[in-house]
Amino acid sequence: YKRQMLEVVIEENVKFVTTSAGDPAKYIHKLKEADIKVFHAVPSLAGALKAIDAGVDGLVVEGTEGGGFKNPEEVGLHVLIQSIRKHTDLPIVAAGGIVDGIGMAAAFAAGADGIQMGTRFVSSLESPVHENFKGAIVNGSEQGTYILNKKAKPCIRALKTELTDKIYEEGLMDMSALSGIKDLYFGGDMNAAPALAGQSIGLINEV
C-alpha cells in the first residue's frame, strides 16, 4: 500500500512530501531521485537525528501539545525545537499548541522557520467538520484533552468525551475506535470516535 502511494506521488510529479511515523530512510531515496523535497515529522530528538541521517530536507517538530498521534514521552514543543536546532540547520516547522501570532513568534524565537496548525483550522469557518466538533473545541480548556493508549502505542491526544473517558480509564485503545471518524467529523457524533485535538483548545474562543 505504501509503495503504491509512493509510486503515485512520483508519477503525479508532486514536489513536496511530508512523512511521519518511523524511519524515513525506506522512502527517501526514491523520493529524492524524483527531485521531491521531503520533510519528516518528529516527536523527539532521537527521531530528528535519525531523519537527518536519512537525508531529509526539513523537519516538522511536533510537541506533545498537539492533537492526534503523539509520542508517549510527552516532550513540549519549545524544548524539542531548541534541542533539535542545536544539531541541524535544516528548516524546522513547529507544530503543537500554536493558534495565533503569539505562538508563531514564540516558535520562531525558539529556532523554528515555520509553523503548522491543526486544531485551530479544525475550528475555523472554512473547516467542513460538524459544528458539534467546532463547538467542543471552542468551549474546551487547556485541560480538556487526554493522551490515550500510553501503555501500548500509538498514543493519541483527543478531546475529553464520554468515549475517551472510558478509553482513558481502561488504559488501552484498539485502533478500531477510530473507524467512526467520519461520523464524528461530518455527522457530529462526538462519541463515534476519539476527537483528535490539541491543548490549544484552551486558547481558541471562537470559530
Positions of predicted regions on the chain:
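Active-site entrance/lid segments in N-terminal catalytic domains of soluble metabolic enzymes
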Residues: 2-87, 91
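Acidic, glycine-rich active-site loops and adjacent beta-strand->loop/helix elements
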Residues: 65, 97-98
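Conserved active-site-proximal phosphate/metal-binding subdomains
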Residues: 71-93, 99-207
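Conserved acidic functional residues
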Residues: 41, 96-97
